[in-house]
Amino acid sequence: QSLMSIQKSIIKLSHIPVQISNQSNCPYIDNKIETRAFVNLSEHPETHDQLAETGFRRVENWAYKPICSDCNECIPLRVICKSFKPNQNQKRCYSQKLIRNILPCQSNKQHYDLFKKYQKQRHKNGLMSKMSWANYSNMINLTPINSMIFEYKCLKGNILGVMLIDIQRDGLSAVYSFYDTTDKKLSIGKYMIIDTINFVKDNKLNYLYLGYFIKENHKMNYKNQFHPYEIYINGKWSKN
């Protein structure tokens, strides 16, 4: 996928400077090299939704998209929320009674403690496992668009999960989530996705953007479990 193809996919944004990163080790697939196209959203926040609709993702003040020359494994995926049909496993998962609180994007120590615990349990050797409080705060607080936090608690009041969410004109985007993995039977990560799908549906929006589906990465290939969904390939969204 070339820069030219990226520029064609956002032809209406031709006045926006699309920058290209240096090559680096791919964070998702071993022995792969990654290159990204990115846009500074702090200078052009109005472009975010159009970029998201062409497969870009947001991190802090930047929108980015992989444009690797020899790999197309990062496939943008969004759930068609109004038609979502949970399977039996998902129905059982969602039968739990968790409390959802909608919060502004402000970092706090309780969430950071859960984040660190999650990284230690699920991504022990990942780049984010050593994230400092300052960097975590940037991830949560730095957003040039409308964003929010979904916080999930059990009935006893313990925080079980947190999801950072961007608000788009056609739905929501799950930017990043983390949760308590101590009791695997709870499937908090799955619960948060189902609940956010239902939130999108209840608010008469269309999609929940889940980011990149990567078949070769078991930590990224769960996203096609939520049907129906669309994937972005060759410059268009196709139902799968």
Regions found by a protein language model. Name each.
Residues 185-197:
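Conserved acetyl-CoA-binding loop-helix of GNAT-fold acetyltransferases
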Residues 194-206:
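Conserved acyl-CoA
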